[in-house]
């Protein structure tokens, strides 16, 4: 299961390295398990598929605003931008860790709306 703070640190570093530093191969080598189960219906399983996804969006960036950990799960809440001028997509990602590696991923994505029915910010 590992230390919760260490698990949180690892997941944040994994996303920083992959999406903000644009080094998906290094991120996979350091943080991803050899078996990587993907629950997003638009993304295939496996480390190679993750690398291909990141490379398909060379301007992509992730701004993680919250990180929560419990047991072998880490949850992030943040903003994904696929291009520099993208308005952004709010993302909630769940990661399952095993033996210090990310082995499973779920996500829920919501485009950042131009208008809101209430005065509350997304974060």
Where do the protein language model's features map onto the residues?
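C-terminal and inter-domain tail/linker signature
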Residues: 1-123
């Amino acid at each position: 299961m590992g230390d919760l703070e260490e698990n949180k640190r690892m997941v944040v570093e994994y996303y920083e390295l992959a999406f903000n530093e644009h080094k998906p191969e290094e991120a996979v080598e350091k943080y991803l398990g050899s078996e990587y189960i993907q629950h997003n219906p638009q993304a295939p399983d496996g480390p190679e598929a993750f690398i291909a996804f990141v490379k398909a969006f060379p301007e992509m960036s992730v701004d993680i605003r919250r990180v929560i950990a419990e047991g072998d799960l880490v949850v992030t809440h943040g903003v994904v931008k696929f291009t520099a001028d993208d308005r952004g997509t709010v993302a909630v990602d769940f990661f399952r860790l095993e033996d210090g590696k990310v082995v499973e991923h779920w996500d829920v994505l919501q485009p950042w709306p131009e208008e809101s029915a209430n005065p509350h910010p997304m974060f």
